[in-house]
Amino acid sequence: MIWVAVVITMLLFILVAKPTGIYLEKAFQGSKKLDKVFGPFEKLIFKITGVKEYNQTWKQYALSLVLLNGFMIVVVYFIFRLQGVLPLNPAHIEGMEPTLAFNTAISFMADTNLQHYSGENGLSYLSQLIGITFLMFAAPATTLALVMAFIRGLAGKELGNFFIDFTRALTRVFLPIAFMAALVFVALGVPQTLDGAVTAQTIDGAKQSILRGPVASFVAIKELGNNGGGFFGANSTHPFENPGQMSNILQMMLMMLLPTALPFTYGRMVGNKKQGRILFVSLFMVFLLGFITITTSELNGNPALNAMGIEHVQGSTEGKEVRFGTVFSSLYATVTTAAETGAVNTMHDTLTPIGGLVPLVNMMLNTVYGGVGAGFVNIIMYAIIAVFISGLMVGRTPEFLGKKIEGKEMKLIAVTILFHPLLILGFSALALSTSLGTDAISHSGFHGLTQVVYEYTSSAANNGSGFEGLGDNTPFWNITTGLVMFLGRYFSLITMLAVAASLKEKTVVPETVGTFRTDNGLFGGIFIGTIVIVGALTFFPMLVLGPIAEFLTLK
């Protein structure tokens, strides 16, 4: 029965992808019906804020994005610092420590949601609503706006205006869908209140304080926007965030909704629907392989316990919620790292070595399917690399969407693809070379190395999940992961927008018999191979020293 539920869940991922992709294309490219519904409200916003409707250059678009995001980071930083004297603080929570406020503000603006604090004890309701929830809308709206400009550039059209795209992302996508999802979560038992903690009497007569809050609205945008941060420290293992299997499936659907839709949006916007389908199918195959790997490893149980003759019919149950079970915990772990959300319904630090390898690889690749917007930019980056390699093999100038891929584009892509592992491995080396980093490690040996690398991988990929055995709420970890999150977020977005702008200016080369097609199974295979060879092999030495070595040791 559990496998039937898994198949149905995956079919739901597939069934909603195309309709959502079509809706996104209409939402951003203009639809009379949508303009009639949302247009008056959007025009009012533009009038109040003074936004002028004109097309920006890629530099203007990128500058607008960075300045607006930077302003939001500063505002939310001071909300965190001053929350102790601000209203909506029934628990009388003190202001955040400076480096923790720095880390948290960047974390949520970068759509990472790395949490070095416990949600219910670290933030007031005002901070949760005005700080955290606000950024949970603004962060994915930023990248959804950018990916639309990116696709327009690839299609040879004007990039558009960041502020208009940003507003449409909020009004036409995130606000309506999150509102409906929040109502469903309330119906499924997720609380939504501004009242303080309630005192309950336990069976043995003791009194217990049960924390609550505006959780349903928080969880809706947490999953839809690929944010991942928890209202409670236990994240989606907490029964108030994720009461049962229905809420669990809904959360996974929300996580996958926009990332899986974007290939179809892309296909419609560039006039090559078949290429969009090929990208979707190729990535789903990689996703499926990851799920099979982690599930097989977790169902085989803990090798150390197996050697003692302990029954393991349910697999490795350490760190997992009984109401979800091993299979759905494995699926959730695959989804949350494939879609770069970072929400967890099981503790990733307790996964088996190969089980923990899958989330780590998903984040290192950062492209299966990746987070809202930013993930799809990485997908196209790998697609262009695949075309470039194929062109070199047959002695032709590589072409993508009829545009020649030349030195300028490949230099930008080369720098972008090297920057991600440089952040992860460079800062991991720094942490391992000083006691400021190693003092946080709770396990020695191979697992300890994996804890460190997982933290920086999660930060660079804007995922936010963690091997929570790491004692990371220290100035060193707050500052270094904050820097990694900021650089990992904005560097690749800007460089790839420059690539799209460069391709926009090029003339379309007529298709000939020798043109390498990017809308068939051959390209799909080369695309997957490129992801594995260029992406995975970059990190292979580290994976051997971490989870693979731990697996071999346990065996």
UniProtKB/Swiss-Prot annotation:
Subcellular location: Cell membrane
Transmembrane portions of the chain: 2-22, 60-80, 130-150, 173-193, 246-266, 278-298, 374-394, 412-432, 483-503, 525-545
Keyword Transport found: yes
InterPro entries: KdpA (IPR004623)
Membrane topology summary: Multi-pass membrane protein
Family that this chain belongs to: Belongs to the KdpA family.
HAMAP family, per database record: KdpA
Protein name as it appears in the record: Potassium-transporting ATPase potassium-binding subunit
Organism: Bacillus anthracis
